[in-house]
A protein has these predicted regions:
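Active-site-proximal alpha-helix that buttresses catalytic centers in soluble enzyme cores
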Residues: 2-77
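Short beta-strand scaffold positions
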Residues: 55-56, 125, 147-148
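Active-site signature of alpha/beta-hydrolase-fold catalytic machinery across serine-
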Residues: 67, 155-159
Length: 214
């Protein structure tokens, strides 16, 4: 089984809300999401098939999944277990903004640690359990495409690679991480954070004026 994990595209900032923050994509994020279907299509063919498109329930993931699901002619199946660790928080700050406006939080995440208010073990157990169920339900030659979050991708990699910290890897917007599951139970991280298809659309690679305009 091949699990293709796609991080969501760039979402907007939400600072005040009466419930959990659930931002939509920015215009730049919409453009990033449009780049994904062509990349995903290369994983289909021959004996292999893209069997399912699944997504976190959070809007930024569902909206990123939509163009790919439409291209493949598949529904987007929402799986609660793929939600990010921040799902219940009343604010959302894109990581590139947190670097400037919430430096302590940014530094903690970049050091590889979940925010202090997050129940780390519960989050990890939820993600790993959901992935195990996905793989168990698939045929050996299936590819499952999962639209999720940087934290979700990272804790799965932490478990597979035996890493100490839960947030080891930078996972870019719309980047692709591929995990292979063998019939014997072996798990292999085939690629991590593939981003060439959106390289020019990542905030760090864009002139400030262009980022402000889109």
């Amino acid at each position: 089984v091949q699990l293709v994990l796609v991080r969501h595209a760039q979402p907007g900032r939400v600072l005040t809300t009466s419930g959990p923050a659930d931002p939509e994509l920015t215009e730049l994020g919409v453009e990033q999401a449009r780049r994904v279907p062509a990349v995903i299509a290369r994983f289909a063919g021959g004996e292999h098939r893209i069997a399912r498109v699944v997504s976190s329930p959070q809007r930024r993931a569902r909206d990123t999944a939509a163009p790919t699901a439409e291209k493949l002619g598949l529904p987007v199946e929402v799986l609660d277990g793929l939600a990010e660790y921040d799902r219940d928080l009343p604010a959302y700050i894109p990581i590139e903004d947190a670097k400037r406006d919430f430096r302590a939080t940014y530094d903690r995440i970049k050091a590889g640690h979940l925010p202090e208010q997050i129940d780390g073990p519960a989050f990890v157990a939820r993600v790993l359990g959901t992935v195990s169920e996905l793989v168990a339900a698939a045929e050996p030659a299936d590819t499952v495409v999962a639209f999720a979050h940087g934290g979700v991708v990272n804790v799965l990699l932490q478990d597979i690679l035996g890493l100490e910290r839960p947030l080891t890897f930078p996972i870019d917007y719309c980047s692709i991480t591929r995990i292979l599951f063998s019939r014997s139970g072996n798990r292999t991280a085939a690629t991590i954070n593939e981003n060439s298809h959106v390289w020019d659309l990542l905030p760090r690679n864009r002139p400030a004026a262009a980022c402000d305009a889109i």
